[in-house]
UniProtKB/Swiss-Prot annotation:
PROSITE patterns: ABC_TRANSPORTER_1, ABC_TRANSPORTER_2. One of its GO terms (biological process) is iron ion transport. It comes from Bacillus anthracis. This is Petrobactin import ATP-binding protein FpuD. ATP binds at residues 37-44.
């Protein structure tokens, strides 16, 4: 397995609170890796550290076998892009202006905007279906369109690795699938390494080549969804009882949570008669 990213005995902390403790992780190159886990388990913290947005307390993070702490910022930005959760664009910024920001790592005092930069921006707009919205204000877009605009910016950055923190947050079901399908296509057609945090376990199973379940500051399980996602994992990681079935469309694990819902309401109403 070729590794795009790797951590060695990585410990991450906020103040004196340890979030991730001596974690060893390998991110496969050219695959979609999705972090899952309960709220507060450290998924987003881990993702931020991979992007060098959070300095490790101890341990190493390797990008193509080189410690990222020793690399220049622009050098990293030419190899890895990150889309944080809920990014906000300045008022009045157009889609085209936003996407152009993805070319910042390639700008210098001597080398300003080039034909290559323009080509990468136009290709990014086309790949995300945003060409027709290029002159539209980012704030005038729907949720799904706005997220596609941000993804276009990361594509314009032209990196082999894209990190995304909960890219479907605040999106309705249609736009969630739209964004995840786009990321899937980028991985399939361009072999980009995609690493993201998702809350929806069923969508994670559907789109991931590689699932990383995080619990108690460590990796609970890692591997293909069909190999690692079972009722015990859901019970241990999410503290929830469920039934694992098979997605009838994709053949991936399908988590059906235990709960009350309408059936229980009907049973209670019947018992009260």
């Amino acid at each position: 397995m070729q590794k795009a990213l790797e951590t060695k005995r990585l410990t991450l902390s906020y103040g004196e609170t340890i979030i991730i403790d001596e974690l060893n992780l390998e991110i496969p190159k050219g695959e979609i890796t999705i972090f899952i886990g309960s709220n507060g388990c450290g998924k987003s913290t881990l993702l931020r550290s991979l992007a060098r947005l959070l300095k490790p307390t101890t341990g190493d993070i390797l990008l193509d076998n080189q410690a990222i702490q020793s690399m220049q910022t622009k050098q990293i930005a030419r190899q890895m892009a990150i889309l944080p959760q809920g990014p906000q664009a300045p008022e009045g910024l157009t889609v085209l202006q936003l996407v152009k920001q993805g070319r910042y790592p390639y700008q210098t005092w001597l080398k300003q905007w080039s034909e290559k930069d323009e080509e990468m921006v136009q290709n990014a707009l086309a790949a995300t279906g945003m060409t027709e919205f290029a002159e539209r204000d980012v704030h005038a877009l729907s949720g799904g369109q706005r997220q596609r605009a941000w993804i276009a910016m990361t594509l314009a950055q032209d990196t082999d690795i894209i990190l995304l923190d909960e890219p479907t947050t605040y999106l309705d079901m249609t736009h969630q699938i739209e964004v995840l399908d786009l990321l899937f296509e980028l991985n399939e057609t361009e072999q980009r390494t995609i690493v993201m945090v998702l809350h929806d376990l069923n969508l994670a199973c559907r789109y991931a080549d590689n699932i990383v379940a995080i619990q108690d500051k460590q990796i609970y399980a890692q591997g293909k969804p069909e190999e690692v996602v079972d009722e015990k994992l859901v019970r241990d990681v999410f503290r929830m009882e469920c039934q694992i079935s098979t997605d009838p469309l994709f053949g991936t694990p399908l988590c059906i949570p235990h709960g009350k819902g309408r059936r229980v309401r009907k049973e209670v109403a019947h018992a009260m008669r």
